[in-house]
């Protein structure tokens, strides 16, 4: 096996192990809450299905971005991916709106800081703020 293939296989195995761990943890939480048990085979099957679905999502997201002549996946691609599930689409849209609002707030805060704090010096005798000239 070539070195690149070995690295890819190793990375895939680590991702599968991580997915299996998370699925196992979630199944344990549900089992504790609902007082039921999950067999190891059920957890393994859920893990495998989850991993394959994530692979499918990743490929679709890459294709959506490539179709739009971009190399970066953005929120519109994720929304397009979730279009078939109304509840998932609504949740992703809500999260997207929150992220956009937070991003806008951060930009406004930075803008205010640069406008008010960037070109100001203090006059120590009178303790007043004097704007510096931009000459």
From Swiss-Prot:
It is found in: Nucleus; Chromosome, Centromere; Chromosome, Centromere, Kinetochore. It comes from the Eukaryota. Its main location: nucleus. GO terms for biological process: cell division; DNA damage response; DNA repair; replication fork processing; resolution of meiotic recombination intermediates. Residues 103-135 are annotated as: Disordered. One of its GO terms (cellular component) is Fanconi anaemia nuclear complex. InterPro entries: CENP-S/Mhf1, Histone-fold. Keywords: Cell cycle, Cell division, Centromere, Chromosome, DNA damage, DNA repair, DNA-binding, Kinetochore, Mitosis, Nucleus. One of its GO terms (molecular function) is chromatin binding. Pfam families: CENP-S. Heterodimer with CENPX, sometimes called MHF; this interaction stabilizes both partners. MHF heterodimers can assemble to form tetrameric structures. MHF also coassemble with CENPT-CENPW heterodimers at centromeres to form the tetrameric CENP-T-W-S-X complex. Forms a discrete complex with FANCM and CENPX, called FANCM-MHF; this interaction, probably mediated by direct binding between CENPS and FANCM, leads to synergistic activation of double-stranded DNA binding and strongly stimulates FANCM-mediated DNA remodeling. Belongs to the TAF9 family. CENP-S/MHF1 subfamily. DNA-binding component of the Fanconi anemia (FA) core complex. Required for the normal activation of the FA pathway, leading to monoubiquitination of the FANCI-FANCD2 complex in response to DNA damage, cellular resistance to DNA cross-linking drugs, and prevention of chromosomal breakage. In complex with CENPX (MHF heterodimer), crucial cofactor for FANCM in both binding and ATP-dependent remodeling of DNA. Stabilizes FANCM. In complex with CENPX and FANCM (but not other FANC proteins), rapidly recruited to blocked forks and promotes gene conversion at blocked replication forks. This is Centromere protein S. The lineage of its organism: Eukaryota, Metazoa, Chordata, Craniata, Vertebrata. The gene is cenps.
